[in-house]
């Protein structure tokens, strides 16, 4: 296999020697009668005419695709969804009933205590 570098080819070809036709098909001769006008009275010899067959001495084979391809890094165009931390404020109400150590009956309502808690939700 021979490498063919030509300035007119976009990429190099590798030549692989080989015949397109078999040798029996290449040499095909056919006997044709001579078409000389009849005014000449001498006998005319028959002529041998060869039908032209194109013969290639080699075949041009393009290189494998992985030889002429440069490594192009793949770019991911789909943006990955990153989780954003969003602070949320929730009110937590604790209801505490206080009892005092006394014999008095307390008729007051239980105390309400409100704390603000900030949590991060992912």
Swiss-Prot record:
Q: Where do the record's region annotations for Disordered lie? A: 100-122
What Pfam families has UniProt attached to this entry? Answer: Casein_kappa
The tissues in which it is expressed are: Mammary gland specific. Secreted in milk.
Which residues are tagged with the site Cleavage?
58-59
Transmembrane parts of this sequence: none
Keywords, comma-separated and alphabetical: Glycoprotein, Milk protein, Phosphoprotein, Secreted
Its GO biological process annotations read: lactation; protein stabilization
Family from the record? Belongs to the kappa-casein family.
Instruction: Quote the protein name from its UniProt record.
Output: Kappa-casein
Which gene is the coding source of this polypeptide chain?
Answer: CSN3
